[in-house]
Every structure is written in structure tokens, then in C-alpha cells.
Amino acid sequence: MSSSSSMECTGNMSAAPLLVLTVAVLAVLASTCAADPEPIQDFCVAVPRAGGEASPAYPGFPCKPASAVVSDDFFFAGLAAAGSTDNPFGASLKPGNVEAFPALNTLGVAINRVDLAPGGVNPLHSHPRAAELVHVITGRMLVGFVSTAGKYYSKVVGEGETFAIPRGLMHFQYNPGNASARAMTVFNSQLPGVVPAATALFGADPEIPDAVLAKSFQVDAEIIKLLKSKFKK
């Protein structure tokens, strides 16, 4: 073997441990950043509760026996039709999470349909367990979020365009146009969870004390009482 071949071989051998280490680190990062646990089988169609929703268990949900799973278990038509936007927000949200679509159990994904009337808004909220992609199908939506540094990021998103929202950050969708708008929102969790900002603060049960909210927002307690009256269940 020539000296150049020997050097090339030695270089490749010395690079091998670094490559292995890099792959190992990336694998660990991927597993720690995943929103849901990794699946250990091809699928695990969730077993619904008597009321129709899946029965929670961690990680994931109880599995329907594989021998009883059929093609229709992997089909979901719940997002095909628009919901009613005849409400104070001018918005409709149809969930496609594991509770609505049991086949998503252990798959680490979910999808929602958002319909907004002109001037309608999907109010400020956050998803503690997932990042989100907002893909506009028809119309336009102003989509925005606020970072932990207090910086506001936003974009008017048109048909066929997509906007990314990082996990856990407060965000919204708003229809600035004169026609209805529709979007599909996709999550990297089968059950992203949702924390509506206004409802969490002013509609909590039991109530957050007026004094705490008044001091936090630097407003009079009467304003807090008025806001709470809008969100009482």
C-alpha cells in the first residue's frame, strides 16, 4: 500500500468515530425534541370511550386489537365541511386530533380546520405540546405570534401559502379580507392541547382573584369584572 493510500485510510478511520458521535447526538436531539413518544409498532388505533372520544392513557391511548382494525379506521371526513362562523368571533375550528380521529394515536400528528368570516378571528391561544403550520386554502389570513422576548412576528398569508408557529407561543389567525377564509393547521402532536389566552385569564374556574388581574394589567378592578362577565361559563 502506498503512503498516500495509507494516509487516506487513516484519515477515514479517524473520521469514523466523529461520524458515529454526530449521528448519535442527532438521534438523541431528535428524540428529545419530539412532541410525542416514538411509536413501537406500525399503528395503534385508539379505543374510543363510550362518549365517542378516545380514552386517555400515557403514552398514547389504548389500542384497538390489530385484528379488528379496518381501512375505514384510517379515514376521517370530519374536516370536509365548514363549521358555523355565526358567533362573536366569526370563527369555526374543527379539530382533527386523536380524540376525533383515533387512527392518529402514536403517529405524532394532528390537523385542524379553521374557517373565518370576514373580520373573524381565531383568538390568541397557545399549544403547549406542539408546533404548528398554518396552510391557507382559500382567502387570506393575518397570522401572528409573540416570542418569549416579546417580539411580534406576523404575515398576511394567501392561498397556498404556509406560516410556521413555534411550540407553546401565543398566536392567532385573523381574516382581514372581505370574503371567507379557510386554513388547515397541522401539528407535530396527536393532542397539541390549547390554552385560550382570554378564557384562561378571565374564565378560569375557580376564578383568578380580581386584585391579581387588576394589578397584573394595571387597570381598575371594575374593568376586570367586565372582562370576566364576557367569559363566564
Swiss-Prot record:
Disulfide-bonded cysteines: 44-63
Origin: domain of life: Eukaryota
Signal sequence extent: 1-35
SMART domains: Cupin_1
GO molecular function terms noted in the UniProt entry: manganese ion binding
Cited InterPro entries: Cupin_1, Germin, Germin_Mn-BS, RmlC-like_jellyroll, RmlC_Cupin_sf
Keyword Membrane: no
GO cellular component: apoplast
Subcellular location: Secreted, Extracellular space, Apoplast
Annotated glycosylation sites: 178
Ranges where the Cupin type-1 domain occurs: 77-225
Database matches in Pfam families: Cupin_1
TM region positions: none
PANTHER family: GERMIN-LIKE PROTEIN SUBFAMILY 3 MEMBER 3
Protein family membership: Belongs to the germin family.
Purpose of the protein: May play a role in plant defense. Probably has no oxalate oxidase activity even if the active site is conserved.
Protein name per the record: Germin-like protein 3-7
